[in-house]
């Protein structure tokens, strides 16, 4: 993918990454609200490539005071534009001050770059990673930026705890709901059930929604924005006592990002499952339950020299995977061997307050 930038009538710059032909491309929402293609990276991966400066006129002298490239990780809060926070800032000098009389190429490399957070484009905040090339000139510096997308990978044990809770209105409604776990990866399926223990109000329908809440700032400068990113009707009609309603919600079809906690001490992203019942008088009864969403690695990283590594050596592991499991045991060499083989809440009518 060629990224071009015009220097008036003098020159143009092109940033080419080393592995463009094989690196995965994903879509991400830009400032214009449209989806754009970007190269995908993970935590710990090196970012390497070449900067091309091409002169538009042959034998034309192009003066500069130096050329550099930066790798930047940045958080920008929209209500405080112009006050971005760079949590990563790496610089490589490509050329000293001088003149260019012909097209020039400058290789660059940022080895094993730490990328602790996931790329995020929110309602009031954005987190981005990008390369910036700067050609320093006497009057105005010339710059070009190339955005990269970073995915933060995680791995959780399969024996996640389920969520069970009984809620109700005294002598009117008493239900028990259950979700199979409280942590879901972005391609997961939410499975659960609703069991009606007591029904003395006329229920018209019931739905489950996924609410995304973005919290930016702290104290009096806190901005909280919530939106419904998914909604699914799970029952139409009046239930009876003893009836059980199954829940099955596929997450893969929705535009979701992982849950985030106090990223750069600037913002958090939380998700809630919102169970809503509506009666025949259009009164709404609801109960929210927070869940964690995480991005699953396609391939689990293996330790070099282990049996699992031998089984997986024909596949490529994705770097930057954060695992939450116990480390694998290592077999120590035997002394006699010359060689060793390493190896409860209530529901109420909706009056602008959560019943939880």
UniProtKB/Swiss-Prot annotation:
Name residues in a coiled coil.
none
Gene name of the record: vps-26
For this chain, the family text in UniProt reads:
Belongs to the VPS26 family.
> Spans of biased composition, class Basic and acidic residues?
331-342
Query: Looking at the UniProt record for this protein, which Gene Ontology cellular component terms does it annotate, in alphabetical order?
Result: cytosol; endosome; retromer complex
Q: Where is this region: Disordered?
A: 301-356
Polar residues compositional bias: what residue ranges?
315-324
Please indicate if the UniProt record lists Transport as a keyword: yes
Name this protein carries in UniProt: Vacuolar protein sorting-associated protein 26
GO biological process per UniProt? intracellular protein transport; retrograde transport, endosome to Golgi
Function of the molecule: May play a role in vesicular protein sorting, similar to the yeast retromer proteins.
**Which source organism does the UniProt entry give?**
Caenorhabditis elegans
Q: Does the keyword Metal-binding apply?
A: no
UniProt entry keywords in alphabetical sequence: Protein transport, Transport
Which InterPro entries is this protein grouped with?
A: Arrestin-like_C, Vps26-related
